[in-house]
Amino acid sequence: MSTFLRRITFLALTIVLCAPFAIESALGQLPQPKAPAPKTAPDPLDRGTPDGTIFGFLEAAQSGNYAIAAQYLQMSPARRQTNGEALAQKLKTVMDIAFAGNLKPSREPEGTPQEGVPGDRQKLGTMSSGDVEADLELVRVSDANAGKIWLIASDTLTKVPEL
């Protein structure tokens, strides 16, 4: 056998014998599929969509259940405990009197993209009284029990007492 044929045969055998190890080594370096994120329980207040949040707030407030209505507001637990019900009642009154907008919020958990509004926010309209004006905005936040939920934004709530 010629030297050239021996070299070709040796090269072919080397490739055939080493290929399984090279493939196994390469596969071991590929990223492994991530385990699915743990499922969170559905939010009992239906705050998973902008639609569920605003109509849940209005339903609770209209029935006079301001403790539940306060759960739709972006505020600390301590502030919710001391001021939540009063602020929910005031917000409902302001919305009844001073809201201007098209109350057709998104039914999608991610909301609907709006020009000039960050992706984690939804602008529903404006409330105005005299020279004071405030956007009615929702913000998407993380909740330890329910995952991502929508709340009436703290930016909106800070303006409510002035309206």
Language-model features: locations:
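N-terminal secretory signal peptides that target proteins for export/translocation
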Residues: 1-6
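Positively charged, low-complexity intrinsically disordered regions
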Residues: 7-8, 18, 30-33
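Bacterial N-terminal signal peptides
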Residues: 10-22
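Soluble extramembrane regions of membrane proteins in the secretory/endomembrane system
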Residues: 25-163
